[in-house]
């Protein structure tokens, strides 16, 4: 039996270990992908600390990693749309019997030398896009894309705000710029993140502790407020602040994960202004991923600055710790088997 290395999370004990496991074999309709790059995401941190739980996992241990790119090593019976050697980026999840299963959460992901996938749950990766940049698109980019284009349905010239300009938020700024949002307001307590937001295309970057934040948002929006606000931080105080600068009929989209209660201090004002709170998770992979790959290939979006470091698979725990502690203010760390 052939084996491989994989970073496995034992969910009950929250223990992450790099182990030698059997190399999977592709069944009918499946392909085996030799992993070239796998992103490390805050969702992985949340899985390890217990904030995020795998509700559909069979068993108690899972190979992490939902941001994965590589080359096809083998194809299973009946697969005609993929060929060995083809460069691909995997969807962050698969639809099974009408239910979406998340890769690296509900079934084994890509923190491994090889990853198994349905042949339909991937997209060709153009030669012009490096594996590391391609790997992060299925979550770090497509999640903001879905939040902006689908959940909030942002239109050109609408004012938008992004709270938390980290691994997803900085890409939200880029996507908002691409879809024509104007102005774009970035909010983050970290001065490095604020500078990063301005470089990504934000019109103004503010500290949430600034007592003049509401006045600054009013000034940049001509007194109208934000048509759409995005919480990528998952912090209750962020939501209160974002609602306070929403325009009438404005949308607050919750992207950052938290187990804290959702509270609106002034419910009467919220209802009177016909504002909305919308939850968001993931994206429509078959629709979003090809579009994003085209935008990157055409130079409309550029994620070369999003790769903050690359580590070998054996140092997966170190990568998680660096992201959790925000050492060096990383956007995305990449594991390479």
Identify the function of each model-found stretch.
Residues 1-4, 240-243, 289-337:
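C-terminal hydrophobic helical "lid"/dimerization subdomain
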Residues 22-38, 52-94, 126-129:
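Glycine-rich beta-strand-centered segment in the early N-terminal region that forms part
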Residues 67-69, 86-87, 114, 159, ...:
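Residue-level marker of beta-strand positions
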Residues 87, 127-210, 215:
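Mid-domain Rossmann-like dinucleotide-binding core that forms the NAD(H)/NADP(H) cofactor-binding site
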Residues 91-120:
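Cysteine-cluster motifs in flexible loop/terminal segments that predominantly coordinate metals
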Residues 203, 235-301, 337:
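Glycine-rich phosphate-binding loop and adjacent beta-alpha segment
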